[in-house]
Amino acid sequence: MNPVSLIFLAFAMSTDAFAAAIGKGSSLDRPRLSEALRTGIIFGVIEAITPLVGWLLGQAASQFVADWDHWIAFVLLVLLGLHMIHNGLRADHATEQEKPGQHSFWILAVTALATSIDALAVGVGLAFVDVNIFLAAGAIGLATMTMVTLGTMLGRALGAVTGKRAEMVGGVVLILVGATILYEHLSAA
């Protein structure tokens, strides 16, 4: 795989995570750069690990992954999105409920895993092409870290505009990302 293709692959793998990061950033109370970097690192590490795991699974598991990856991502993202919408609705009835300063590690890790399932499938495919898997995984992780950090900060700006509804907007974004993943896989079949 040539370097230009690798760069395009890395950024393509980061787009779902970028969209999710916008939602996550909008649901926080003015996230600082350190929180955006923390979010980016968590997403980047997970996004770098998943193609390695996929590569190790090889062709034997590729049919299972190809058949179910979109459903797994869809369900996880919809559940996380509904949870965020529920929290946003609950915040409307609470008096002076504050947004969190940061999301828990586990919420970020599950979101990152849900948005990186496609990278798992890509990793399986990379097992059959001439590519340094460690270089590819590193490029995917670095691109994702960068895009998620930027997405979190962009979400911060959107959160200031949307006010109390920011978490609901973030939930809708996650559901739309999940629906897009499902649609793309079903329409390609």
From Swiss-Prot:
The keyword Cell membrane applies. It comes from the Bacteria. One of its GO terms (cellular component) is plasma membrane. GO terms for biological process: intracellular manganese ion homeostasis; manganese ion export across plasma membrane. Keywords: Cell inner membrane, Cell membrane, Ion transport, Manganese, Membrane, Transmembrane, Transmembrane helix, Transport. The chain crosses the membrane at residues 3-23, 41-61, 65-85, 106-128, 141-161, 168-188. It is a multi-pass membrane protein. GO terms for molecular function: manganese ion transmembrane transporter activity. Its main location: membrane. It is found in: Cell inner membrane. Probably functions as a manganese efflux pump. Belongs to the MntP (TC 9.B.29) family. This is Putative manganese efflux pump MntP. It comes from Pseudomonas aeruginosa (strain ATCC 15692 / DSM 22644 / CIP 104116 / JCM 14847 / LMG 12228 / 1C / PRS 101 / PAO1). The gene is mntP.
